[in-house]
Amino acid sequence: IYTLSLHDALPISSLTARVKDELSRIDGSCDECAYVELSAIMRICGTLSLQADGTYFMRMSTETGAVARVMIKLIHGLFGLDTPMTMQRSSLQRARTYLIDIPDQGKLAGVLARLGIIVPGRGQQSGIPTQLLSRRCCRQAFVRGAFMAGGFIADPTRDFHLEMALAGEELAQGIAGLLVPFGIDARINHRRGSSVLYVKSFDEIVLLLRLMEADLSVRTVESARRVKSLKNEVNRRVNAELANQARSIGAAA
């Protein structure tokens, strides 16, 4: 038995859940987009095992209900595979984890090859499936799937940043390369066995949300930035006025 990838989930914020819910409702621009999106999700959320009899078995996990629905919808709709699902709840954090099993069913190897996860005769493909990404809309779908599978976006009124926990350096570098032509300079660090791709520039995060076609989320974060900017300006003026009053009192004393 060997493992292809294991998703080390980032903590989920309420904004992250809303973004993923929005992304889960987006249909790609061409028929291939659905395959590409599923390919990204399976690479990041899936653990692939080779059984003793030579067949494959995959278990996918996510803490987001909307993403679990996308997994099941795409696997059923594209390939007609059965996907038994169980739900686990942490007694300490009360977090739900959805576990979706994909037994071989006589065709899982073909599914994995169709999605570019394995290459017949050469084994697993750990980077991005470049053969599936010739169209712009498919590159968008791959990034969208990657964020649904491993993404996190922080509160824009605080330390605003966006991250994706990815299964390996090669996949992280591949996605970072996909983002460059769109004006997004993503960086990579390593945390708890995952390669974490991150973006900290507000403008680049907005570009990334637009790339994924999360237009509602763009409006949400832009509105939050305006509120934060207004609060900062009010605080600056109040502090300046207090400083002026202190100087006046000191001069009069």
Give residue spans per PLM region:
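Single conserved hydrophobic/aromatic residue that forms the stacking wall/gate
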Residues: 1-9
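Extended mid-to-C-terminal alpha-helical interaction segments
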Residues: 211-253
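Generic detector of short, well-ordered, non-transmembrane alpha-helical segments enriched
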Residues: 6-7, 36, 141
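Short acidic (Asp/Glu) and glycine-rich catalytic loops that position anionic groups and cofactors
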Residues: 48-53, 122, 155, 232-236, ...
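Generic, ordered loop/turn and secondary-structure boundary motif
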Residues: 2, 24, 43, 49, ...
